[in-house]
Each structure stands twice: as C-alpha cells, then as structure tokens.
Regions:
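Long, non-globular segments of proteins
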Residues: 1-220
Length: 220
C-alpha cells in the first residue's frame, strides 16, 4: 500500500519482473532441430531400427549435439537426461565415409560431434569356453551385440601410454567402447595364440580370435 492507502501495483509488477529475471531459462528441446523425427519413428515402428543406410536426404548442417567420451549425450552443452530420447536418437546415427557422424531422418541429415565412440559397452555376457566361446555386449543404449566376423573387436593403443582401448563394431561404422570394468573382465578371458609365427594375447568369440597385443609386450 502507498501512503494514501492505494495499492502499489507498480511495486508488484517490479517484483514479478525481478523474479522473471532470475528464473533459469527453459531447457532447450533437443528434438527441435529434427523435422523428420516423427517420420523416422513411423518408418521403424514394429520393424526394429530405422533404415538410415537407405535414406539419402540433403545435408542440413551441423547441430550443437555431442556424444561425450563418457557416453552422455549433450544438446547445447546440457546433458540429455531422458534415456528414451537418447535411445531414439541413437537409432538415427550414421557414420559416413567422410568419417563424420550424422543423425539421419527421411528428410534431413545433420552433423553431430562424437568425442570418442558412439556407444559404451556396459555389460558382457559370456557363453561357452575356449574357441567355442561367444561374447555378447549390451550398450548404454540397450543394443545387444555378439562379437563375430561381422561385429569384430579392435584394440587401439592410447597415445602416450601403454594402455589399450577396446572397441566393438555395433552396426554400420558405429562402435562401442568397453567401459574399464568390462575391459578388465574381458582380459580375464584372454588366451595366447600363435599367428604367423608370433604369439598374440587375445580373446575368442564366435569362432574368431581377436588379438589384443603381442604376448611379449604383456609379459606372457
């Protein structure tokens, strides 16, 4: 109230404006840049993954979306916290011959940034033993991948260290990086095999031997 008993409307409006000024801005909607998202989901309904390899839309530029080395997806530097949405985006991933990764729908292709791998392998299923062993991995986006000739493993030596980074081909040119704990479990399954006169340490899966490193380098 003012001194003359009237309501101080201007003061109330000032408080509202001040509250609006300090309120955090609404989170950006990561689905906004993708006009063809509904078409992509409709194309795959009841049929598994969308056929992104058969779609050839025009390139519509890059968007501010990134898959971090820790497997977390970001849009405009904010984590995308809705796992179903991340899972949906992951089904639209395609890595082309140019080495770049895109989200692809029937009507658009947009570039995104990938810090390391497209997925993380977060659990491992082991069946059988020896050369009859079969390894399956589940990714952070719920893909299940059996390691075989079509889905090989590769081991990359880290720059400046003697460590190895293990990757699995999930589909197309998309790979999953094993988490450290899963890699330790994988190493426990390793055996030595002679290849072209040299002893290699590696693992078996689906009748294929996947060499990690020369046995001499790891003291075997």
């Amino acid at each position: 109230m003012t001194n003359d008993g009237t309501a101080d409307l201007d003061g109330g409006q000032a408080e509202v404006k001040e509250a609006q000024a300090v309120a955090p801005p609404p989170a950006a909607d990561p689905t906004q840049p993708l006009r063809g998202l509904s078409e992509a989901t409709a194309a795959s309904r009841g049929r598994g993954l969308p056929p992104v390899d058969r779609w050839n839309p025009e390139f519509c530029g890059d968007i501010d979306m990134r898959i971090g080395a820790d497997g977390i997806w970001y849009y405009q530097n904010s984590p995308i916290g809705r796992k179903p949405l991340v899972r949906l985006f992951s089904t639209l991933l395609r890595k082309d011959e140019d080495g770049k990764t895109y989200l692809v729908t029937p009507v658009e292709k947009v570039g995104i940034t990938v810090d390391d791998a497209h997925f993380l392998a977060v659990s491992m299923i082991v069946e059988g033993e020896g050369d009859a062993q079969v390894l399956r991995f589940v990714t952070n986006c719920d893909d299940e991948v059996t390691v075989d000739a079509d889905h090989p493993m590769r081991f990359v030596r880290q720059k400046g260290t003697d460590g190895l980074k293990p990757y699995i081909l999930v589909r197309g040119r998309l790979e999953a990086l094993l988490t450290r704990s899963i890699f330790y479990d994988l190493v426990e399954l390793g055996v030595t095999r002679t290849i072209d006169g040299a002893d290699w340490f590696g693992v078996w899966s689906s009748g294929q031997f996947f060499p990690m490193a020369p046995a001499a380098e790891i003291g075997l």
